[in-house]
Design a protein with these regions (language model features):
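A hydrophobic, helix-centered structural microdomain
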Residues: 1-41, 147, 152-194, 200, ...
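A short, structured surface patch at a secondary-structure boundary
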Residues: 2, 51-113, 154-157
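Short solvent-exposed loop/turn micro-motifs enriched in small/polar/acidic residues
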Residues: 13-16, 104, 114-116
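Short, hydrophobic secondary-structure boundary micro-motifs
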Residues: 18-19, 46-47, 87-89, 94-95, ...
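Short, glycine-rich, amphipathic interfacial segments at transmembrane boundaries or analogous
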Residues: 18-57, 117-136
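A generic "alpha-helical surface" signal
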Residues: 56-59, 145, 149
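Short beta-strand/loop motif that positions the catalytic acidic residue
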Residues: 133, 139-142, 155
C-alpha cells in the first residue's frame, strides 16, 4: 500500500486517500475509503460521480488502480472499523441511485447486513447492471447469505479482477423510486451513468469532497 501511496503522490496533486459518504447497515452513514484515482474536485466537473471509458479526470495511476481494483484496498480499514464486511451488498452513495427515503421497504432489506468490499451483484454484472436489478441481487444475497456463498463470491471476484470484466460504466442505467402520488408505484428514468452529476449542495451535505 505504501508503494501505491507514493505512486499517487508522484502522479498528481491531492490526497492519497479519497473519502466519501455511503449508506451502510440499517441506513447508517459512514465514510468509505479508497485510493484516489481521479483528479481533485472531479465530482464537481465533467460527468460528475461516475467515470466512463477514457474519462480524462482519471489519473494515469488511477487507471491502473481501477483496472486492478487496487483502489478499493483502503476499505479494509472500513472492515476493521466494523463499517463493512468482506462480502455483502456494495454501499451506495447517500444521494444515488436515490436518497434513503425513496427506497422501498423491499429495497431497504439489502441494508439488513453490513455492506461488503465485494458482493453478489459485483460478480453478476458489476458496473454493467442497472440499479433495480443490482438491488434485487443484493436482496437475494441477504435472503441466501451463507459461508459457502461468500466463498463462491470471493472466488468469482478474483476471476473478475484478473479478467477486468464489467469494470467500465459503459451504458445506460435505469433508476427508480416510489412516486409521491401512488404509494409503492415506481417511476423509471433512463439516464446515462456518465451524466450523474451531484449538485454542490449534495456534495457539501454528504462531504463528498476529497480532503
Amino acid at each position: 500500500m505504501l508503494i501505491i501511496a507514493i505512486a499517487i503522490k508522484c502522479d498528481s496533486k491531492g490526497p492519497v486517500i479519497f473519502k466519501q459518504e455511503r449508506v451502510g447497515m440499517k441506513g447508517k452513514i459512514f465514510k468509505i475509503y479508497k485510493f484516489r484515482s481521479m483528479c481533485v474536485g472531479a465530482e464537481q466537473t465533467g460527468s460528475g460521480v461516475y467515470s466512463g471509458k477514457g474519462d480524462a479526470r482519471v489519473t494515469k495511476v488511477g487507471k491502473i488502480l481501477r483496472a486492478t481494483s487496487l483502489d478499493e484496498l483502503p476499505q479494509f480499514f472500513n472492515l476493521l472499523k466494523g463499517d463493512m464486511s468482506l462480502v455483502g451488498p456494495r454501499p451506495p452513495l447517500t444521494y444515488h441511485p436515490w436518497v434513503w427515503d425513496k427506497y422501498t421497504e423491499e429495497q431497504k432489506r439489502m441494508f439488513d447486513v453490513r455492506p461488503g468490499i465485494t458482493g453478489w451483484a459485483q460478480v453478476n454484472g458489476r458496473k454493467d447492471v442497472e440499479w433495480n436489478k443490482r438491488i434485487k441481487l443484493n436482496v437475494w444475497y441477504v435472503d441466501h447469505v451463507s459461508l459457502w456463498l461468500d466463498i463462491k463470491i470471493l472466488f468469482k471476484t478474483v476471476a473478475k479482477v484478473f479478467s477486468n470484466a464489467d469494470n467500465e460504466n459503459t451504458g445506460a442505467t435505469v433508476v427508480s423510486a416510489p412516486t409521491d402520488e401512488v404509494p409503492g408505484e415506481t417511476i423509471q428514468t433512463e439516464i446515462l451513468i456518465e451524466e450523474v452529476v451531484p449538485s454542490e449542495t449534495q456534495i457539501q451535505q454528504t462531504e463528498n469532497k476529497e480532503e
